[in-house]
From Swiss-Prot:
<feature type="binding site">
    <location>
        <position position="404"/>
    </location>
    <ligand>
        <name>L-glutamine</name>
    </ligand>
</feature>
<comment type="subunit">
    <text>Homotetramer.</text>
</comment>
<dbReference type="GO" id="GO:0003883">
    <property type="term" value="F:CTP synthase activity"/>
</dbReference>
<dbReference type="Pfam" id="PF00117">
    <property type="entry name" value="GATase"/>
</dbReference>
<feature type="binding site">
    <location>
        <begin position="187"/>
        <end position="192"/>
    </location>
    <ligand>
        <name>UTP</name>
    </ligand>
</feature>
<comment type="pathway">
    <text>Pyrimidine metabolism; CTP biosynthesis via de novo pathway; CTP from UDP: step 2/2.</text>
</comment>
<keyword id="KW-0436">Ligase</keyword>
<dbReference type="GO" id="GO:0005524">
    <property type="term" value="F:ATP binding"/>
</dbReference>
<feature type="region of interest" description="Amidoligase domain">
    <location>
        <begin position="1"/>
        <end position="266"/>
    </location>
</feature>
<dbReference type="InterPro" id="IPR017456">
    <property type="entry name" value="CTP_synthase_N"/>
</dbReference>
<feature type="binding site">
    <location>
        <position position="223"/>
    </location>
    <ligand>
        <name>CTP</name>
    </ligand>
</feature>
<feature type="binding site">
    <location>
        <begin position="147"/>
        <end position="149"/>
    </location>
    <ligand>
        <name>CTP</name>
    </ligand>
</feature>
<feature type="binding site">
    <location>
        <position position="471"/>
    </location>
    <ligand>
        <name>L-glutamine</name>
    </ligand>
</feature>
<keyword id="KW-0067">ATP-binding</keyword>
<dbReference type="InterPro" id="IPR017926">
    <property type="entry name" value="GATASE"/>
</dbReference>
<feature type="active site">
    <location>
        <position position="518"/>
    </location>
</feature>
<dbReference type="GO" id="GO:0005829">
    <property type="term" value="C:cytosol"/>
</dbReference>
Length: 545
């Protein structure tokens, strides 16, 4: 029997609902419960797959190929025993699309289709399906209480709390306690009004997570409890922390997990062992060195566009006991600036992306890393550009490019793949006319690493499984001239022998991959590719120190 914790936010957005929810999930998992998480997004897009990173940040890809909200990345990084799937994230657009398709098929037998019950029932069905087979499902509702877009979701939550009952549901509400400097005082009124908004919908919160920059005394907590109908011990203070990985310990010390276990009847569980989280924080706060990684991209003004890459570098720093300082370099400005701005970097990374804009700047950075012997990691488009740069400047194919940038090129080193097998082994097809949404090679795919290569050495095994999100691949017609010039194809997809990884054997550390290793990195376990990359950066730092 699954228990549900619904997570809402009030006063302002960006309070950290996802991190708070993931921290609670980590606590419950540490007590032995089987936990999953769900993110409900009120926007009308079917999924974030075609949204600009400037609008939405990164698109997180699950094992089964769902293009989802970046919060699912937090969920997976905080949980060890649960992987997110297509069931764990859905939007208003997805719900309305499903309901309208049913209406067109005649499933509603000519009845009037309405928000209540048709939309709300669809939402409830999705929540219940995602929670099936778990002890606890933590369900985050995107946006802020009172937003018009989120009303169907809030009504669905209200109905579920009534239908499932008090002993199977809880609501955790995040709110802001602003500090007024002129009065030297924390203000509780925004929290009171936020809860009032919830109550007007018919929902009473059970736990309040109060975000603040300052300590909160017992009197203030009692005042909040009095005016919100919440127990004083359920008013949880979430003061700004040095790292998000301190939040599980913070919640543990305020007995958030005890509150939940009491409510759900989990009275005989062992206490949570958070020693692994303590080790993560200890390594973060006591680095031996600082290494600088230049990340060359076109969305660098918004770090959330590369959230999982940023986190994977942080995790690799933990593994190597170094602090990773990321220097964001705009690829377009690099085309007009002196390339020597990269001279302070201990390593260079070119992440994934789409489109031609900024590609010349990225290739300048790749060439610099290759010629100067600086550790380089290319991801997705970063791999494709590494191959193009090598083809142009080493293999003698001066006009080499991708058909993404020039469909009529005579040297299509990178081309559109028209057929591939999905994660279920089923044939998928596309063409240049296909819709952008949902037409990529997505999700976990097996690859075989070539024996004797650095990539094989880094992973420590022959077969790996990594997640993909791309339309274009290296053209196998050009493998021979590329390898003859010195670049090594070090990995191929198991199913179709597509190029997955390349490296330059004569370089200290130059690896580029078609997949997205950042999606499977975690603070407690890291990822072998990023760990090796930062180890190489550390050696580069010590060499040039």
């Amino acid at each position: 029997m699954t228990h549900f914790i619904f997570v809402t936010g009030g006063v302002v957005s960006s309070l950290g609902k996802g991190i708070s929810a993931a921290s609670v999930a980590a606590l419950l998992e540490a007590r032995g419960l089987k936990v999953t998480m769900v993110k409900m997004d009120p926007y009308i897009n079917v999924d974030p797959g075609t949204m600009s990173p400037f609008q939405h940040g990164e698109v997180f890809v699950t094992e089964d190929g769902a293009e989802t909200d970046l919060d699912l990345g937090y969920y997976e990084r905080f949980l060890r025993r649960a992987k997110m799937t297509k069931l764990n994230n859905f939007t208003s657009g997805r719900v309305y699309q499903d309901v309208l398709n049913k209406e067109r098929r005649g499933d509603y037998l000519g009845g009037t289709v309405q928000v209540i019950p048709h939309i709300t029932d669809n939402i409830k069905e999705r929540v219940l399906a995602a929670g099936e087979g778990y002890d606890v499902a933590i369900v985050e509702i995107g946006g802020t209480v009172g937003d018009i877009e989120s009303l169907p979701f809030m009504e669905s939550v209200r109905q579920l709390m009534v239908e499932l009952g008090h002993k199977r549901t809880m609501l955790m509400h995040l709110t802001l306690l602003p500090y007024i400097r002129s009065a030297a005082e924390l203000k509780t009124k925004p929290t009171q009004h936020s809860v009032k908004e919830l109550l007007s919908i018919g929902i009473q919160p059970d736990i309040l997570i109060c975000r603040t920059e300052h300590d909160v005394d017992a009197d203030t907590k009692r005042k909040i409890a009095l005016f919100t109908n919440v127990e004083a011990r359920a008013v949880v203070v979430c003061k700004d922390a040095k790292t998000i990985y301190q939040i599980p310990r913070n919640f543990y010390e305020q007995k958030v997990d005890d509150l939940i276990c009491e409510r759900f009847g989990y009275n005989d569980l062992p206490q949570a062992d958070l020693s692994d989280w303590d080790q993560v924080c200890e390594a973060l706060f006591n680095p031996e060195y600082i290494v600088r990684v230049a990340m060359v991209g076109k969305y660098v003004e918004l770090p959330d566009a590369y959230k999982s890459v940023n986190e994977a570098l942080l995790h690799a720093g933990i593994q190597n006991r170094v602090k990773v300082q990321i220097d964001y370099v705009d690829a377009e400005t690099l085309e007009t600036q002196d390339i020597s701005i990269l001279s302070t970097a201990d390593a260079i990374l070119v992440p994934g992306g789409f489109g031609e804009r900024g590609t010349e700047g990225k290739m300048l950075a790749i060439k610099y890393a290759r010629e100067q012997g600086i550790p380089f990691l290319g991801i997705c488009l970063g791999m494709q550009l590494a191959v193009i740069e090598y083809a142009r400047n080493v293999a003698g194919l001066a006009e080499a490019t991708s058909t993404e940038f020039n469909r009529s090129t005579k040297f299509p080193i990178i081309g559109l793949i028209t057929e591939w097998l999905d994660e279920r082994g089923e044939l998928q097809q596309r063409s240049v006319e296909s819709d952008l949404g949902g037409t990529m090679r997505l999700g976990a795919q097996k690859s075989e690493l070539v024996e004797g290569t650095k990539t094989r050495q880094v992973y420590g095994k022959a077969e790996i499984v990594e997640r993909h999100r791309h339309r274009y691949e290296m053209n196998d017609r050009f493998i021979e001239p590329i390898e003859k010039a010195g670049m090594k194809i070090s990995g191929y997809s198991t199913a179709q022998h597509l190029v997955e990884t390349v490296e330059i054997p004569e370089h200290p550390w130059f690896i580029a991959v078609q997949f997205h290793p950042e999606f499977t990195s975690s603070p407690r376990d890291g990822h072998p590719l990023f760990a090796s990359f930062i180890d190489a950066a550390k050696k580069q730092h010590l060499k040039t120190k």
